[in-house]
């Protein structure tokens, strides 16, 4: 039996209301102070993971810091807390531990965490990129578009997920715009992309102007607040929001019935899996970052796989191959905890066609 663990944390104080309704009545500052003092702990035992080649069990480990705390508290304190989580996983018998959300971003993106543990560590970012591109391509096709005629925008293009996504998307689209707060790393990446691909490449730190012309948007920033609003997008745009917390405001889906918003990396996993914890997904599905940890465990690949600020495209392709081998698949589309059906996508397409016919843009 292979063994793995996965570290996760509340994205915001509001997430704690799912644990206890009384949290709704307590000040955020009080809850954050309590979370800072609380030690990591085992949340649940994961059973039933089984592919044609192997079986595995695992554990969820709770890191009691919100996303805001992870970027505002001293880096050393946060990294030490994540290492504590990893040591719990180690004591439980896990041979690889996965990082989620901001635990994979803080500090040097998992490298120091791995150095302080005796088990393998992965961020899950390689499979996150693979499935985000796969899902975006499929959704775009259902919307009646071909990637090779599309203008794509990657928001957060200088990060590990963003830059890897750029490298893969650039091989498929007509034009790609890289967006981030700091231009120098974008310009360096753009030069690399231009040398290796035939698509047109642009860079900018002006997100709204870039989005207005985008057929495809892949957004992967570590922003704590929404950065994409309803007025930013053109009719027919396909937006894949990989970020946690989300980059795309809920108002986009509520106010723009001519724009398709999907979440990146929702995966169907093999076996009859019981997470013994409700994180809002249907049975036998998970985030792609979680799935990467499971795939590596089933394969017996107990090595540091996706760490640091740069992702290897060869590893993205490799984890995709291993996912296919162990029967991990894209589980359709979701947005704000709801399924996005093909019928809904076709309705968005009709609304976009009508909007373009009426307004001509």
Predicted regions and their residues:
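Adenosine-phosphate binding glycine-rich loop
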Residues: 2, 6-8, 19-57, 64-67, ...
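Conserved acidic residues
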Residues: 3, 95, 174, 215, ...
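Glycine/serine-rich phosphate-binding loop and adjoining beta1-alpha1 elements at the start
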Residues: 50-147, 275-287, 299
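A short helix-to-beta-strand connector/capping loop
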Residues: 56-57, 117-119, 196-202, 257
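Short, ordered loop/turn segments at secondary-structure junctions
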Residues: 101-104, 126-127, 181, 244, ...
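Short, charged/polar "capping" segments at the starts of alpha-helices
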Residues: 104-108, 183-188, 247-250
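Glycine-rich phosphate/diphosphate-binding loop of Rossmann-like nucleotide-binding domains
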Residues: 138-216
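Rossmann-like adenosine-cofactor binding region
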Residues: 198-272
């Amino acid at each position: 039996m292979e063994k793995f663990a996965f570290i996760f944390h509340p994205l915001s104080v509001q997430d704690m209301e799912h644990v206890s309704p009384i949290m709704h009545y307590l000040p955020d500052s009080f809850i954050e102070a309590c979370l800072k003092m609380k030690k990591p702990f085992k949340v649940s035992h994961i059973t039933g993971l089984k592919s044609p080649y192997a079986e595995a069990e695992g554990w969820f480990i709770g890191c009691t810091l919100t996303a805001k705390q992870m970027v505002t508290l001293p880096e050393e304190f946060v990294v030490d807390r994540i290492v504590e989580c990893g040591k719990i996983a180690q004591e439980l018998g896990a041979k690889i531990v996965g990082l989620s959300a901001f635990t994979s971003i803080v500090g040097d993106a998992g490298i120091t965490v791995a150095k302080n543990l005796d088990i393998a560590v992965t961020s899950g970012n390689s499979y996150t990129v693979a499935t985000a591109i796969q899902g975006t391509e499929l959704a775009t096709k259902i919307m009646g578009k071909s990637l090779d005629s599309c203008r794509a925008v990657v928001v957060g293009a200088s990060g590990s997920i963003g830059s890897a996504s750029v490298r893969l998307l650039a091989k498929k689209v007509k034009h790609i715009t890289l967006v981030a707060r700091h231009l120098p790393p974008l310009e360096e990446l753009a030069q690399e992309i231009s040398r290796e691909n035939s698509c047109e490449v642009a860079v900018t730190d002006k997100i709204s102007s870039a989005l207005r012309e985008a057929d495809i948007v892949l957004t992967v920033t570590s922003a704590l607040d929404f950065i994409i609003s309803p007025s930013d997008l053109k009719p027919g745009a396909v937006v894949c929001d990989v970020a946690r917390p989300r980059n795309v405001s809920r108002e986009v889906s509520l106010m723009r019935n001519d724009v398709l918003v999907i979440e990146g990396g929702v995966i169907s996993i093999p076996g009859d899996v019981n997470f013994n914890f409700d994180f809002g997904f249907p049975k036998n599905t998970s985030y792609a970052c979680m799935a990467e940890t499971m795939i590596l465990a089933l394969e017996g690949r107990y090595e540091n796989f996706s760490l640091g600020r740069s992702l290897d495209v060869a590893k993205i392709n490799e984890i995709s191959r291993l996912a296919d081998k162990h029967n991990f698949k894209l589980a359709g589309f979701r947005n704000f905890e709801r399924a996005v059906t093909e019928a809904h996508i076709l309705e968005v397409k009709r609304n976009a066609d009508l909007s373009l016919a009426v307004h001509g843009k």
